[in-house]
């Protein structure tokens, strides 16, 4: 097969409320959008006993071997969905540990490549199970529209085709998502009709912001 390439877009939380926690996951309310910053993923079949994964680019140096691409391929193999082995090449343009879901979006993009080219065939229920096995944010990579998380781990689509300008700053500091959520001690009161708040984003907040600032200043 020829090499197949696809863009893997970053996501951004335009607000984020931590409204509670289940046994394993925090419950989030958030308006989420994909943005024009993207990684580039290429895939081709290889004659090998194992899959091969190659990262390159400015933000590739700190990615470990147990990354989301590795995890995705391992799960698809375990489910006996892949009959061949593949070389996956990822050019990293999305900063690592930036909160923009680079790893999760890469996993989603890889699955979409497999599905689009009929390498794997899975129904919606199976896809949801696989996505959740990889990571909580993977499902966000399957929509081009602005989305919102309703606080119960469900993704809803906002029926808005809105263009907006976004200015991104890349600080010198990194802070892992796992660490940030481990420091959440208080929960916000759930917002009503969060999907109607899009036109007034200035009134919303990010519950994780103060935790990150405190970490940087310590």
Predicted regions and their residues:
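Conserved, helical-rich catalytic subdomain that frames metal- and/or nucleotide-binding sites
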Residues: 51-53, 143, 147-218
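A short, flexible low-complexity segment enriched in Lys/Arg and Gly/Pro that occurs
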Residues: 70-85, 112, 202-218
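ATP-binding N-lobe of GHMP and related small-molecule kinases
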Residues: 1-98, 115-125, 170
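Short, glycine/charged-enriched secondary-structure capping and boundary segments
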Residues: 28-29, 104, 182-184
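DPxDG-like acidic metal-binding loop motif
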Residues: 98-127, 140-142
């Amino acid at each position: 097969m020829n090499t197949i390439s696809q863009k893997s877009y970053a996501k951004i939380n335009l607000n984020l409320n931590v409204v509670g926690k289940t046994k394993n996951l925090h419950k989030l309310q958030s308006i989420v959008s994909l943005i024009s910053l993207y990684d580039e993923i290429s895939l081709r079949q290889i004659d090998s006993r194992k899959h091969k994964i190659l990262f390159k680019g400015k933000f590739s140096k700190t990615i470990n071997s147990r990354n989301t691409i590795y995890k995705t391929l391992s799960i698809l193999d375990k489910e006996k969905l892949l009959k061949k082995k593949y070389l996956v090449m990822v050019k990293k343009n999305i900063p690592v540990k930036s909160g923009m879901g680079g790893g999760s979006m890469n996993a989603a993009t890889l699955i979409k490549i497999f599905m689009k080219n009929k390498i794997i065939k899975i129904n919606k229920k199976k896809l949801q199970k696989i996505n959740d096995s990889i990571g909580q944010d993977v499902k966000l990579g399957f929509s081009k529209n602005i989305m919102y998380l309703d606080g119960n781990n469900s993704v809803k689509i906002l029926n808005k085709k809105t263009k907006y300008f976004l200015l991104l700053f890349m600080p010198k500091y990194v802070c892992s998502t796992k660490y940030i959520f481990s420091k959440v001690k208080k929960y916000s009161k759930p917002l009503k009709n969060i999907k109607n708040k899009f036109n007034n984003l200035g009134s919303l907040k990010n519950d994780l912001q103060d935790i990150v600032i405190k970490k940087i200043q310590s």
